[in-house]
Each structure stands twice: as C-alpha cells, then as structure tokens.
Amino acid sequence: MATKLQDGNTPCLAATPSEPRPTVLVFDSGVGGLSVYDEIRHLLPDLHYIYAFDNVAFPYGEKSEAFIVERVVAIVTAVQKRYPLALAVVACNTASTVSLPALREKFDFPVVGVVPAIKPAARLTANGIVGLLATRGTVKRSYTHELIARFANECQIEMLGSAEMVELAEAKLHGEDVSLDALKRILRPWLRMKEPPDTVVLGCTHFPLLQEELLQVLPEGTRLVDSGAAIARRTAWLLEHEAPDAKSADANIAFCMAMTPEAEQLLPVLQRYGFETLEKLAVLG
C-alpha cells in the first residue's frame, strides 16, 4: 500500500517506477513556488520533480539576508543528499535576491532564481506607470532598485510591500476564501491614485495564486506580469545545455521541514500538482 505521508528521511513507498528522468528541485519558503513549478511542468512535463517548502522559517520576507542564505543552502544540500539534482529553481524572490551566489558556488548543477519581471512590464505599460507588488524585503533590497534603474528608468514605479498577501495566498491553497476587502485595503495606495499602474509586476511567487482576486480588485484592464514562463524557458535551456546527468525513476515528491497539521492539510493540493507524497526533510543547521 502506498504511503502518502512520511515523517523523516525514509524511502518513499509510493514511488511509481518509470523511466529515469532529470531531477529538478523547486524550492520556496511556502507554497507560492507552485506557481513557478506549474509553468515549468507545463513546458517540461516529463521530468522528475521535487518540491520543497520551508514551513519552519516561513515567511522569508521578514528574515535577515544571512539567515536566508544559510537556510537555503542547508535545505538544498539536504535534498541533494537524497536525490542527485540536475537543476534547482529557487522559486522565491526574496531568497533569489540573496542566496544565488552561495548556491552557485557550492553546487555543480545550474541554479535558477526568480527576479521581479520589471523588464517586460516596462515594455508592456501604456501609461508609463508600473506597479511592483512584492514582499517588503524585495521592495527594500538594492537588487530590486538596480533592476528598476536598468530596465525601467523611464517609467514611474509604484511599489507596495505586503507580507499579508503571502498569508492570503497560503490560506487560499488551504481552501480558505480570499477576502477582497483585505486586498482592497492592501492596494488602497494604488486604488486612490488618479492614474494608477496599468501594469503590475507580481514580485512574489505567491501572488500569481491570487491572480483571479487581484483582477477583481484592480482597475479593469490592468495587466499582471510574473516571471513564471521565463523561468520555465530558462530551465529548459539549462537542462539541455548545462545540467549534469542526474536522473531518477521515482515519483514526484514534496518535502516540508516540519510535518505539522497545516502541512498535512496541503497533501491534496500537492497531489493535484502531481506530487504523490509529502515527507519531512531532515536539515542540518
């Protein structure tokens, strides 16, 4: 009988034998990275996917850079010990802006990060006003401001940092309704503008999960832009040209850092995304 929930680094009994496929890790502090994973899976359905989320240290947006770097390196190391990786995707804007150099120095497989889609948004805007919706950490970091200066210096950039929206996205995947009133309150600075942004960058991987609700609250015709499709294309290129030959015939698997009741409640969601099992990952440090 298949074991659907496992606590600890024990073999996954629910794995279904198949042809070996390149193993790709998608990692986030929470479940927002599933939006990126979905784009990658749509383009590359025949891979062995691992999804890992750090429900112990979630959310990363309020953590120090040193903590994030140490934590992300430790988690990727723990996954790599279980499954040799062909490629890893850090599907978290906050973690990507600070941890990529350390990851690329430590590991010999490609590591793909997620950055706010400032460049395409600057090309799409008609009124020259672009909104960046992200965590407070992403909004404050110099990397984000460098992206704006490089790719959108002729645009008016309106930034909103929100940790509450991350929580709303997590709650939605747990089956809870999203409060449109809460979104209106968060977006109030834009909604009060005489000419609000006509293009909004979803600068946190959690936020595409709220796309339907955001479109109900933002002015009609507002474009929402995220990095998911671009990350999928980059992943495909790297797997073809630079990835090591790291394959597995196991079924797709998800890892949490603590097997809490809240994590267990996510199993049906993870199964809808194609992950057969959820295990606790032992992380050193």
Curated annotation (Swiss-Prot):
The protein's annotated pathway: Cell wall biogenesis; peptidoglycan biosynthesis
One GO BP: cell wall organization
Task: Give the keywords, sorted.
Answer: Cell shape, Cell wall biogenesis/degradation, Isomerase, Peptidoglycan synthesis
User: Pfam families of this UniProt entry?
Assistant: Asp_Glu_race
Enzyme class, top EC level, equals isomerase
* Entry annotation: catalytic residues: 92, 204
Keyword match Translocase: no
The residues the record assigns to binding substrate are 28-29, 60-61, 93-94, 205-206
Q: What's the domain of life for this entry?
A: Bacteria
The UniProt record lists the keyword Cell wall biogenesis/degradation:
yes
Q: Which GO terms describe its molecular function?
A: glutamate racemase activity
> Family assignment?
Belongs to the aspartate/glutamate racemases family.
Summarizing the function annotation, the protein's role is: Provides the (R)-glutamate required for cell wall biosynthesis.
Q: Which NCBIfam families match?
A: glut_race, PRK00865.1-1
Provide the protein name.
Answer: Glutamate racemase
Q: Which organism is it from?
A: Escherichia coli O7:K1 (strain IAI39 / ExPEC)
